Structures are given as C-alpha cells and as structure tokens.
Curated annotation (Swiss-Prot):
Region (G4): 136-139
Gene of this entry: tuf1
Protein name according to UniProt: Elongation factor Tu
HAMAP family: EF_Tu_B (MF_00118_B)
Catalytic activity: GTP + H2O = GDP + phosphate + H(+)
Positions annotated to bind GTP: 19-26, 81-85, 136-139
Residue sites binding Mg(2+) per the record: T26
Pfam family, one: GTP_EFTU_D2
Length: 396
C-alpha cells in the first residue's frame, strides 16, 4: 500500500502515553497506529519497532523515545512513547518531547501502581494540560464490578493530584485485542472511542505565533548611527517594527521601542516565532542589555528569583555528579541563554539527593530571571550539566 501523504492542514497536537511499566503503553501506541491505518490516518507501527526506541540527547541528557505520527478526523498528532520509567522522568522534566496532553494507561487487572502515581504527579508538576485514561487489559477482567472499582481508584488518584478526576474520560478496552483482531468491541472500537475522547477532551494548544511576543537575548551589538541591535531566536509571538517592548531579567525592567527587524541582513517589517532576527532598539545603550535577558510584550512576563521546581539529577554514568547534594547546594541554573547561581532548598524530610533521583525543590536565584511556570532549565556546575528541571510554581 502506498504511504498516504499527510495533509498539513489539520491542527497539530503533541501527545504521549504514560503509566506503569507493563500496563500496555507501547501496545496501545501500536494499536492506535493499526486502527487509524485503516482510514489512511497512520502507518501501522508494530510493537517491537516502537519498543527499540532510538536514544536522543536533550539538554545534555540521553533519553530513549519513540515517535509515531497519525491523524484523526480533526487533528494531526505526534505521539511519544518511552521504553523505560527513567526515560519518562527525564522526558517530562526536560520537555524533550513536549506534551499538550497525555493518555494515561492503567491495567484493569492491576489497577493504579507506583509509577501510575508518579507519572500523574510528574504530569501535574511539569504542566501537562490534560489527561485521558485508557483502562487496558479489560479482556482479563470478567467481573464488571471490579472494573468499576479500578475506575473509581483511578479517578480518586487523579483528583488527589489536582486533575479533574470526575470529568476525565476513561475508555475501557484492550490494546492486544485491537492488535490481534480478537474482540472488536474491546479492541478496534475502544481505540476509536479513545481517539474521539482525545480529540474532544485535550484542548488544542495555542500556536507559538499566537502567544505574546518573547525573544531570549543571545547577543548585543551597537551599530554606529543606528543604535543597539539585539539578536536571538523568537520563541513565540510576533515583533513588528514600531512595537513597544520590555527588556526583562537580571536588572530592572526597561521599556523600549523596536525600530527595525532584520533577518539575514535584510530589513523586514516583522519577525515571528521561529525566526532568528536582529531587533533594533530605540534609545537603548549597548551596556543596558545582556545575554540572559528577554525582549517581550510589555507586562507579559515578570522577573522572579524564588520558585518551586521539579528536577532530575544525572547519574555519574550520564556525566553527572558522583556524590549526593544537600540543602544549600549552590549550582548554576541555565535559563534559555545564560547561567544564574541559585541556592537549593530541599523539602522537609529529604536529607539529600542522590545522582539519578528526581526531586521537588525550592530555588532562590541571586538575580531575577524572566520566568513563568513550565519554563525548563539545566542545572550546571562549571559548565557541565548535572541535572535538568522545570519551574513548577513561582514563589516570588
């Protein structure tokens, strides 16, 4: 069969499968591609192809992730599936594979298990906006009351971690039945129902171009007779010539006006998300701006020094620390384009953090950085990455 060409006209959404080991995340991923392949919305990808996921590097950390793509009536999806639990932790914290939503896979035969809990907590901490549940292996449970019990347990667990447990769609089925064509109701039909729920329940993410303008400062030049040019890659939004913008982070926030946008030495009337541009700033001196600050739409982002974070600390095999660290550890936190020193405060009852751990912690930076929830950072010691993290909540 000829490979169907993907039409890029549908809105795009990034999702992934999460849940406890052996509850059927990878089987479900394969089953989705199998069922959607019937309507030309996917190319069937077998279990073993997904399971031997290639290694990738994100922020200096090696992660194994499998990527498949498929489409439904409404959307085009990029779907990530990780072979091991550690890969999920790293993936979600580094944002290597950004998730606009996730399918939580729970085995009906086992109910929620330790990693079910941990993945829900991680999804909450790193800001995954919405979850849909697939209750897998329902063909192994004969008692409908038992299924209801597991469903109640899952809903309670979701509510405990501040997801709307009562409203989240839970689809009952069997990924294996779909792969083996054994039971149409629990297999094929359940997968289609799952995708209908994912389409309906996971909100369409706002495209970067529609969000308020932000550009991390990479370099600053002064051009005689023209003023100061700041270069960088536009992270989101649009910058038009004549726009008023703020310079945020490290020092007091300054206001300025963009009097020119250039790309590849040509003058443009605007730069947008994804563009590498130089922005000419009116009346701003070369020494007023530095790498590590951001240009942004006025009022859209504030500078902060204290925040709660979820972080993963590299093992020594991954090039990380060889020894644990304690409260008052002072590494550098690399945000966007620069390192800022910060002090780590561990939660009550956590004596120390070992290489390979993931941990919730509080950080106090010595200078403010433009930040918001979900912002990713690296933890470094003398330029060497020893961890990765994400801002879970801002304190001040």
């Amino acid at each position: 069969m000829a490979k169907a060409k993907f039409e890029r006209t549908k809105p795009h959404c990034n999702i992934g499968t999460i849940g406890h080991v052996d509850h059927g995340k990878t089987s479900l991923t394969a089953a989705i591609t199998k069922v959607l392949a019937e309507t030309g919305g996917a190319t069937f990808t077998a279990y073993d192809q997904i399971d031997k996921a290639p290694e990738e590097k994100a922020r200096g950390i090696t992660i194994s992730t499998a990527h498949v793509e498929y489409e439904t009536q409404n959307r085009h999806y990029a779907h990530v599936d990780c072979p091991g639990h550690a890969d999920y932790v790293k993936n979600m914290i580094t944002g290597a594979a950004q998730m606009d939503g996730a399918i939580l896979v729970v085995s009906a035969a086992d109910g929620p298990m330790p990693q079910t809990r941990e993945h829900i907590l991680l999804a909450r901490q790193v800001g995954v906006p919405a979850l849909v549940v697939f209750l897998n292996k329902c063909d192994m449970v004969d008692d409908p009351e038992l299924l209801e019990l597991v469903e109640m347990e899952v809903r309670e667990l979701l509510s405990k971690y501040d997801f709307p447990g009562d409203d989240i769609p839970i689809v009952k089925g069997s990924a294996l039945a779909a792969l083996e064509n054994s039971d149409a109701k629990l297999g094929h039909d359940a997968i289609l129902e799952l995708m209908r729920q994912v389409d309906a329940y996971i909100p369409q993410p706002e495209r970067p171009i529609d969000q308020p303008f932000l550009m991390p400062v990479e370099d600053v030049f002064s051009i005689s007779g023209r003023g100061t040019v700041v270069t960088g890659r536009v992270e989101r939004g649009i910058l038009k010539v004549g726009d008023e913008i703020e310079i945020v982070g490290i020092r007091d926030t300054q206001k300025t006006t963009c009097t020119g946008v250039e790309m590849f030495r040509k003058l443009l009337d605007q730069g947008q998300a994804g563009d590498n541009i130089g922005a000419l700033l009116r009346g701003t001196k070369r020494e007023d701006v530095e790498r590590g600050q951001v240009l942004c739409k006025p009022g859209s982002v504030k500078p902060h020094t204290k925040f709660k974070a979820e972080a993963y600390i590299l093992t020594k095999e991954e090039g990380g620390r060889h020894t644990p660290f304690f409260t008052n550890y002072r590494p550098q936190f690399y945000f966007r384009t620069t390192d800022v020193t910060g002090v780590v405060h561990l939660p009550e009852g956590t004596e120390m953090v070992m290489p390979g751990d993931n941990i919730a912690m509080e950080v106090h930076l010595i200078v403010p950085i433009a930040m918001e929830e979900k912002l990713r950072f690296a933890i470094r010691e003398g330029g060497r990455t020893v961890g990765a993290g994400v801002v879970a909540a801002i304190i001040e």
